[in-house]
Amino acid sequence: MNGTEGPYFYVPMVNTTGVVRSPYEYPQYYLVNPAAFAVLGAYMFFLIIFGFPINFLTLYVTLEHKKLRTPLNYILLNLAVADLFMVIGGFTTTMYSSMHGYFVLGRLGCNLEGFSATLGGMISLWSLAVLAIERWVVVCKPTSNFRFGENHAIMGVSLTWTMALACTVPPLVGWSRYIPEGMQCSCGIDYYTRAEGFNNESFVLYMFFCHFMVPLIIIFFCYGRLLCAVKEAAAAQQESETTQRAEREVTRMVILMVIGYLVCWLPYASVAWFIFTHQGSEFGPLFMTIPAFFAKSSSIYNPVIYICMNKQFRNCMITTLFCGKNPFEGEEEGASSTKTEASSASSVSPA
């Protein structure tokens, strides 16, 4: 084994010199340059000061503007709540721990931080999958005479929480466990060991296939069908510049959505799978820390892609920030006037 395993921790360094210590009790500066902990803390601070305001503003603006409280927007609000879970429950703890060089909150704190951060991440991940399903259903209408309503939206939100809890509760009750990961300043699922009594192998397989591959397949299928439907509508109205413009915007948006999902989860899932299938191989603390950066950054670019680029949300946010007036209203109206012929296609687009 090219690491040191202890009670509820795994440090990616062989303890041949006797320097390895518990990440719950001692600074881990022997793992990487101490400056790396400062960089980690600064990055967490950056995510907090940008991630919290933009997600909180999303919720506040929705309360302020009744027209935003529509069933199709429920999942976007759920996405903002998920990001706030990550910011409040995960990023603050990681920043505080990085300032000390180790996970200072102990075993209980590791469980709470691992649960909160993973819960937020899983709600966010499943929200993107449900959002893809909702947009596919609304635009492609696979079922005739179907009308998307509040009950369907509530079912979608409930599904995200059910799947997220199905992923995050088991490590608290003995199916796998939360342990410090990477630079030992944040906690996550134990991909590193085959600790006796925790059945890590079965849980990691369950996580990878059910909570990564399934949402990925859903997103590719739904957005693939949606793009086909939009292109067919555009082909039927080739003389309409409006329809062509809407098609380009929807295509751009779908590409952004898929890339956003892959950038967020593919590095983390790939590295976790590699560690799981190559247990005993040598890898440094940064090997898991850097992919986690991508997953955590979703708290910023998810709102930008899915909320701030949504014309209705964007206008309401600007109106709220400018005390009831939108200084860009003329430009927005001029841009939107060219899209009236393609309302069904542009309903999937945030622009």
From Swiss-Prot:
Residues 62-73, 134-152, 225-252, 309-351 are cytoplasmic. GO terms for biological process: absorption of visible light; G protein-coupled opsin signaling pathway; visual perception. A lipid is attached at C323 (S-palmitoyl cysteine). Keywords: Cell projection, Chromophore, Disulfide bond, G-protein coupled receptor, Glycoprotein, Lipoprotein, Membrane, Palmitate, Phosphoprotein, Photoreceptor protein, Receptor, Retinal protein, Sensory transduction, Transducer, Transmembrane, Transmembrane helix, Vision. Signal peptide: none annotated. Residues 1-36, 97-110, 174-202, 275-286 are extracellular. It is a multi-pass membrane protein. InterPro entries: GPCR_opsins (IPR050125), GPCR_Rhodpsn (IPR000276), GPCR_Rhodpsn_7TM (IPR017452), Opsin (IPR001760), Retinal_BS (IPR027430), Rhodopsin (IPR000732), Rhodopsin_N (IPR019477). Residues 330-351 are annotated as: Disordered. One of its GO terms (molecular function) is 11-cis retinal binding. GO terms for cellular component: membrane; photoreceptor disc membrane; plasma membrane. It comes from the Eukaryota. Glycans are attached at N2, N15, N200. Residues 335-351 have a biased composition (Low complexity). Phosphorylated on some or all of the serine and threonine residues present in the C-terminal region. Contains one covalently linked retinal chromophore. It is found in: Membrane; Cell projection, Cilium, Photoreceptor outer segment. The chain crosses the membrane at residues 37-61, 74-96, 111-133, 153-173, 203-224, 253-274, 287-308. Disulfide bonds join C110-C187. Belongs to the G-protein coupled receptor 1 family. Opsin subfamily. This is Rhodopsin. It comes from Neoniphon sammara (Spotfin squirrelfish). The gene is rho.
